[in-house]
Amino acid sequence: MSHRILSPPAGLLSDEDVVDSPILESTAADLRSVVRKDLLSDCSVISASLEDKQALLEDTSEKVKVYLRIRPFLTSELDRQEDQGCVCIENTETLVLQAPKDSFALKSNERGVGQATHKFTFSQIFGPEVGQVAFFNLTMKEMVKDVLKGQNWLIYTYGVTNSGKTYTIQGTSKDAGILPQSLALIFNSLQGQLHPTPDLKPLLSNEVIWLDSKQIRQEEMKKLSLLIGGLQEEELSTSVKKRVHTESRIGASNSFDSGVAGLSSTSQFTSSSQLDETSQLWAQPDTVPVSVPADIRFSVWISFFEIYNELLYDLLEPPSHQHKRQTLRLCEDQNGNPYVKDLNWIHVRDVEEAWKLLKVGRKNQSFASTHMNQQSSRSHSIFSIRILHLQGEGDIVPKISELSLCDLAGSERCKHQKSGERLKEAGNINTSLHTLGRCIAALRQNQQNRSKQNLIPFRDSKLTRVFQGFFTGRGRSCMIVNVNPCASTYDETLHAAKFSALASQLVHAPPVHLGIPSLHSFIKKHSPQVGPGLEKEDKADSDLEDSPEDEADVSVYGKEELLQVVEAMKALLLKERQEKLQLEIQLREEICNEMVEQMQQREQWCSERLDNQKELMEELYEEKLKILKESLTTFYQEQIQERDEKIEELETLLQEAKQQPAAQQSGGLSLLRRSQRLAASASTQQFQEVKAELEQCKTELSSTTAELHKYQQVLKPPPPAKPFTIDVDKKLEEGQKNIRLLRTELQKLGQSLQSAERACCHSTGAGKLRQALTNCDDILIKQNQTLAELQNNMVLVKLDLQKKAACIAEQYHTVLKLQGQASAKKRLGANQENQQPNHQPPGKKPFLRNLLPRTPTCQSSTDSSPYARILRSRHSPLLKSPFGKKY
């Protein structure tokens, strides 16, 4: 027994035609299957017309169609007050969902999360009043026409459980769904053009296999056993038909999501007469049959399988004594297209056989009673119709088109099924539907962002693996969303609407064509001689493209021709590598040049910005330095002016002090002579005390001078402040000169005092001596006052120098420390205020003229002894202020 496996011809499914077919729209991709040598010259092709290719190109930008259908309320649902207006149709394309009370969406909205009203757009919305025939004419009719023309279509229903998905797909005996109506339209359109014998059978994803007479009889016996097995079960169930008639009615009235009234397990007892009536009814639809080419014959094959708990089961499996069903494997062909291994494909001749086989598959499908549906589909069922387009009477390579209708199991929250087998089923159903949503979201993102392509998780679920071909180039897809308008299922309905919103954004885009030359073109180009058989084939197919069969079967070519092809391919590969290397070098050079240019531009921008910032900072600091210079100049000019005034005043006082001793000395000599005998002992003691006081003043003066030199070294200003300190140093030198002059005068007074003492020893004038001592005391007090004023002046100069040094140092290091100058001035001002006498008001700042009185105060007459005056001068507070603190 020999099997002959064929792939579609070049004019239909070759690499060159992939460009004309969009993603989700094109027919099955070619397979490099082995073609028998004796069939190569007899193969004929059915090439797509130019108009069909143009139509395909026009549809490349079309979005995926998503239809919405709302089922009506049941009487029991109206009794439970499920109609709360949560599902509203705004127009034929817009649906508004309003969250009812006690729904999770409304509670989230009250907490500030989410929205209470959602609006969705669909290709078309069908209300509860739309019947099955109208729904089919508006949705499925054009898709069936495309399938008869050679395209592949996938239609899948999505929605929560008990939303009417199975009713939309299969319907009832009186109101057929889209699947029976599609079968009726297909067979009505193919009347008189069906292939008489099933000698070609679909295989893998898009291949066919030739069957001999024995294999044809086996296929017929398999179909007959399925049909007879179904009829025997119907005859056995006739005896209990009356007993379950009431239960079937209840089940039909409470369920919209299972095969009701003739398709569910509760209504499997429809008689053969009813089947005949149903098939006759579907065989005569109101729609006009689709016109197909008259020179083409068609062969219709169907398959029916389910995905239950991530396991694949054939629903058209012949009856056997085994209680455990055999699981199927999901495999890939050599081109990566998925297919179900060992899946039964049954040849059908009319709609009645297809309906009976559908009924047999429904009996084998997994149903169960759930919280929301008494007869709920617990698996994803996929009913596929493959049509082989045959031309000619001999051996042919057919074109294959496929129509797949998938009844997805309803999504349901696990809170309704908390344990047992139903919980496991619900988990697997929700997982597969979630994976389908992820795949659709990834496809949408890849279409919107061409530069960054994400991996599409088709392999995470068996359902998405089956759908992969329709989503990636082998056909087109359509989604039918079924909505349950009950308020209790609003949250699930909202999730289904959001899921469909992703699918509605997918766009049919053409796949990438690599443009790789075929093996036949290599041989024609590089072979010097062509065989006679190939010459005939080239003449017959001169207007067609290279078929994949020529590439698949290399036995028709000679060894030398194949070696030449290998050498040509090596040369072509080397050329391509050189071109790609040159392109890579060029791209790298361009990228490097662009990067260098960008770096230069950035460097230039940074340098310009730094220059601008530098100029701004220089202007800012120059302005600040200018302001500071003006303020310092004004301040020190005022200080110098006030200091000059004080020095002039001190000089005036010094001149007065010099003149007074000279005037009083002449009169004091006579007094000294008269009183020297009376006050000899007292004057000697007072002189010693005055001498000791003078020595103490000298010691303090020397220590003050040393301390002044020390502070001058410490407070030596930086070079920028040198012009300001020169004037101050000059004034300080003048003050020191005045101090030296005062010392000289003090020495002269001491000498005069000694001479007066010697004179007192020889004179007896006590009154004159007392008067002379009084004058000396006055002179000493004035000198002490003058010395104290000079010392205070020196302290002020030190303080001013400290201010200047601190200010200039802060300016020299950073301009930001200028604010600290004000606080330093405040602290220094506070120290000066602490030196003020207690009787001065706080609002005035004492200056040099306020520190010491200009004229000596009058002494009290009660305490006028020389000893008391000396004690007062020693305990004067004016002498404590400059030396009592350490600056």
UniProtKB/Swiss-Prot annotation:
CDD domains: KISc_KIF23_like, RBD_KIF20A. Residues 559-804 form a coiled coil. Residues 856-865 have a biased composition (Polar residues). The modification Phosphoserine is found at residues 7, 14, 21, 527, 683, 823, 865, 876, 881. It comes from the Eukaryota. Residues 543-553 have a biased composition (Acidic residues). Keywords: Acetylation, ATP-binding, Coiled coil, Cytoplasm, Cytoskeleton, Golgi apparatus, Microtubule, Motor protein, Nucleotide-binding, Phosphoprotein, Protein transport, Transport. Residues 805-887 are annotated as: Globular. One of its GO terms (biological process) is midbody abscission. Phosphorylated by PLK1 at Ser-527 during mitosis, creating a docking site for PLK1 and recruiting PLK1 at central spindle. Mitotic kinesin required for chromosome passenger complex (CPC)-mediated cytokinesis. Following phosphorylation by PLK1, involved in recruitment of PLK1 to the central spindle. Interacts with guanosine triphosphate (GTP)-bound forms of RAB6A and RAB6B. May act as a motor required for the retrograde RAB6 regulated transport of Golgi membranes and associated vesicles along microtubules. Has a microtubule plus end-directed motility. This is Kinesin-like protein KIF20A. It comes from Mus musculus. The gene is Kif20a.
